[in-house]
Amino acid sequence: MADLQQLEDQIVSLSLLDAAALVKKLEERLGVSAAAAAPVVVAGGAAGAGAAEAAAEQTEFTVILKDAGANKINTIKAVREVTALGLKEAKDLVDGAPKPLKENISKEDAEAIKKKFDGVATIEIK
């Protein structure tokens, strides 16, 4: 039990970059993904109309970087602010656009991110 507490304390004390590296290593070693699974809506018979209304009221959004724009440096800076990625990871994300920046976030957070990239890069919210 004390070993678990020590492990928890060590994990909590990691920097964000170290924690991200730990997650990647665990994903590779265990063959899993830390990304949240997308919710699945199954509609059947009379419940179909209710399910369609629920789908129309989306609560989780994905912010996608569609195009880095003319000034990649400013885009990389904005990506780092929004995602807390390191410089190399942010550059790779910008160079590989279109790619998701943030997934499963609220509409307010998605709009705030879109405002941050206004005039810097092309952002799409899904």
From Swiss-Prot:
Hydrolase keyword on record: no
Pfam families: Ribosomal_L12, Ribosomal_L12_N
Gene Ontology, cellular component aspect: cytoplasm; ribonucleoprotein complex; ribosome
GO BP term, example: translation
Presence of the UniProt keyword Ribosomal protein in the record: yes
Top-rank lineage group of the source organism: Bacteria
Disulphide bond pairs: none
Entry keyword set: Ribonucleoprotein, Ribosomal protein
GO molecular function terms attached to this record: mRNA binding; structural constituent of ribosome
Function: Forms part of the ribosomal stalk which helps the ribosome interact with GTP-bound translation factors. Is thus essential for accurate translation.
Family classification: Belongs to the bacterial ribosomal protein bL12 family.
Subunit structure of this chain's protein: Homodimer. Part of the ribosomal stalk of the 50S ribosomal subunit. Forms a multimeric L10(L12)X complex, where L10 forms an elongated spine to which 2 to 4 L12 dimers bind in a sequential fashion. Binds GTP-bound translation factors.
HAMAP family referenced in this protein's UniProt entry, alphabetically: Ribosomal_bL12
Descriptive protein name: Large ribosomal subunit protein bL12
Organism: Acidobacterium capsulatum (strain ATCC 51196 / DSM 11244 / BCRC 80197 / JCM 7670 / NBRC 15755 / NCIMB 13165 / 161)
